[in-house]
Amino acid sequence: MSMTASLALTVPELILSVGALLLLLVAAFGGDGFARAIGWGAVALFAAAGFSLTGPAGNGGPGFDGLYIADSFAAFAKLLIYIAAAVSVAVAPGFFSRTGGGYRAEYPVLILLSGVGMGMMVSAGDLLTLYVGLELQSLSAYVLASFMRRDTRSAEAGLKYFVLGALASGILLYGISLLYGFTGTTLFAGISDSLAKGMGTGQMFGMVFVFAGLAFKISAVPFHMWTPDVYEGAPTPVTAFFASAPKVAGMALLLRVAIEAMGSGTDTWRQIVVFAALASTILGAVAAIGQTSMKRLLAYSSINNVGFALFGLAAGSADGVAATMTYMAVYVAMTLGSFICVLQMRGQDGQPVETIASLSGLSRSRPGLAAAFAIFMFSLAGIPPLFGFWPKFLVFDALVRAGFWPLAMVGIATSVIGAFYYLKIVKTIYFDDPAPAEFAPAASKLEGGLITLAALAVSPLGYLAIPLLDATSMAAARSLF
């Protein structure tokens, strides 16, 4: 493939990277007075990048001699990433203005650059492309976590994320070096051909280290330790971003590496994935029960949900991968809706309300917000008829079809345990004695509109999208096999 044809495959990344540089120039000369305009410019760039997926960038095949892959799988993941990133940019100005943190023009630019990295991650066809994309996303994320530099919690979150992220990157690089040393290539196709001839001890160790590095990025147990502290300390729009877009990118990257690069060693890596899935669902469900902070509880909820998504990968089939992609699509809607609800929860003094006990009385002062948050909690718990039930059903169905019904039974049990803390929040909102402090009225029609859209998406109306989701997720999954 010619250089021009290869570049045509990377149009989404070109749009975001060139746009980020132009917006950075505007910020340099215009200052923070242009911050809101730059933010909406970033949203427009994400929309343009998503629209470009209708061309060769959506299904053009491999480019740059296999280093970059533009297929249905990458297009599906990128669309979710761009939606989550755009929402995270759109809701940020209101939060920073209310908290006095100061909304600066660098925020949307960092999200754009992170989007470029995530796009490279899901389209990677080579271990080095994987690493460059992952590091571009991570470096932007470290700065975003500590964006409110005068807030000690935010600074602490950024430092913890940076130190542990650097450790995970080192582990990943070591795994890449082992795989290169024992297979003689960094291309996914070449690694797959090498493993098809038999997996040696060195190759197995390389695979384990690569999986460990990627597990950190998706907060899978036992590499989850950074998640509760970073989610709690980072600004809430940043936390919403961390819990959605990078999760999709990391999960998509793990799926591509497992199926395309290491499909010949499925029986070996399945043991790792099964352990991570079980540990994540169990720890996420149990550890969340004792939490008092809303953001920490949602952090453990994200760990729990990653475990369920990994069950689809453990099935090792196209049905399992399609179920995982459907799970991530619905998860993005539920998570963004939940965090925007948290953004709306403020006292009369304008300060955020982040403790679960403070939610008592929300149903009286903000009945609409309380109802929406309850919908998201029930949906995250997977309680029918809400749409959050459907992806869990697909994941368990894929496990049973693959013959792993004991794993499905454990997953169902942890889902029941996890429902406890979601129901605890609903009970606090509707049945506990009202807290003395009153909630401030809604201050953003945009946030209210986004909450409404997300609530409708995870309501029973979401089942109308099943034919579309099934078709697109299965097309995405089949492009890996």
From Swiss-Prot:
Single annotated GO MF: NADH:ubiquinone reductase (non-electrogenic) activity
Domain of life of the source: Bacteria
Subcellular compartments: Cell inner membrane
Catalytically driven reaction(s): a quinone + NADH + 5 H(+)(in) = a quinol + NAD(+) + 4 H(+)(out)
Record carries keyword Membrane: yes
Membrane-related topology note: Multi-pass membrane protein
InterPro entries, alphabetized: NADH-Q_OxRdtase_suN/2, ND/Mrp_TM
Broad EC category: translocase
Pfam families named among the record's database cross-references: Proton_antipo_M
EC nos: 7.1.1.-
TM spans (from-to): 14-34, 38-57, 76-96, 108-128, 162-182, 204-224, 235-255, 272-292, 297-317, 323-343, 369-389, 403-423, 449-469
Entry keyword set: Cell inner membrane, Cell membrane, Membrane, NAD, Quinone, Translocase, Transmembrane, Transmembrane helix, Transport, Ubiquinone
GO cellular component: plasma membrane
GO BP terms in the entry: ATP synthesis coupled electron transport
Known role: NDH-1 shuttles electrons from NADH, via FMN and iron-sulfur (Fe-S) centers, to quinones in the respiratory chain. The immediate electron acceptor for the enzyme in this species is believed to be ubiquinone. Couples the redox reaction to proton translocation (for every two electrons transferred, four hydrogen ions are translocated across the cytoplasmic membrane), and thus conserves the redox energy in a proton gradient.
Family of the protein in this entry: Belongs to the complex I subunit 2 family.
Quaternary organization: NDH-1 is composed of 14 different subunits. Subunits NuoA, H, J, K, L, M, N constitute the membrane sector of the complex.
Protein name, entry field: NADH-quinone oxidoreductase subunit N
Organism in which the protein naturally occurs: Rhizorhabdus wittichii (strain DSM 6014 / CCUG 31198 / JCM 15750 / NBRC 105917 / EY 4224 / RW1) (Sphingomonas wittichii)
